[in-house]
């Protein structure tokens, strides 16, 4: 059984590693060109087997439908400095020829009830195996550093309380999500100040 899981997950691991390399290379290309990169850093993971099994049970996913019905077995996360960078990255990914966007969820304009904000893409990505090509679904989450900090804390609390966060804590989390987003908006305003031409530049 362990070998079965290893063989099943190996292409997903390959997909995550390839995408991390490509996105980090893209970040480097921005910097070499003298432009500010909308990508701050990139992480990725393959969902642990216990988490896959738990989600299969919760969503009643049959083993033979696992690749089709579970979209986040492979996950890549892109962190950005500013909210505007998130939408720049989304556009970059939409235009790429090595993947196809099949689903988008904008939790920034429409946050989850908990306060969670992020932009989710589900893409199909081709992995070249020894004798064939395999199309895999990969979930790409794009968020700011502030959104990621909040989501990390919320995830830890969900784990601690086994998915049942006390109402008082949930209310404070929701409030802190608004504070984090206000910080993002303020940082965007500051970004506009230092990227806009100064009065001295306009006179030249």
Explain the meaning of each model-derived region.
Residues 1-55:
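Intrinsically disordered, low-complexity polar/charged tails and linkers
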Residues 3, 89, 190-192:
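Charge-rich amphipathic alpha-helical interaction elements
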Residues 31-32, 62-70, 110:
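Short, flexible, solvent-exposed loop/turn segments with mixed acidic/basic and small polar residues
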Residues 52-66:
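Short amphipathic beta-strand starts and helix->beta connectors
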Residues 67, 80-187:
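Long beta-strand-rich cores associated with HINT superfamily self-processing modules
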Residues 72-76:
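Short amphipathic alpha-helical segments
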Residues 194-199, 203:
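Conserved small/polar residues in nucleotide/adenosyl-binding loops
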């Amino acid at each position: 059984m362990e070998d079965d899981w290893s063989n099943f997950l190996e292409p997903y691991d390959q997909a995550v590693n390839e995408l991390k390399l490509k996105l980090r290379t893209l970040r480097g290309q921005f910097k070499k060109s003298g432009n500010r990169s909308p990508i701050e850093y990139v992480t990725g993971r393959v969902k642990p087997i216990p988490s896959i099994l738990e989600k299969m049970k919760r969503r009643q996913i049959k083993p033979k439908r696992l690749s089709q019905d579970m979209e986040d077995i492979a996950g890549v996360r892109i962190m950005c400095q500013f909210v505007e960078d998130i939408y720049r990255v989304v556009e970059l990914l939409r235009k790429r020829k090595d993947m196809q966007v099949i689903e988008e969820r904008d939790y920034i304009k429409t946050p989850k009830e908990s306060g969670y904000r992020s932009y989710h893409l589900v893409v199909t990505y081709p992995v070249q195996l020894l004798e064939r090509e395999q199309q895999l679904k990969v979930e790409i989450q794009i968020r700011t550093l502030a959104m990621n900090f909040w989501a990390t804390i919320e995830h830890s609390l969900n784990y601690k309380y086994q998915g049942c966060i006390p109402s008082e804590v949930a209310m404070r989390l929701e409030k802190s999500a608004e504070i984090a987003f206000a910080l993002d908006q303020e940082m965007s305003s500051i970004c506009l100040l230092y990227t806009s031409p100064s009065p001295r530049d306009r006179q030249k």
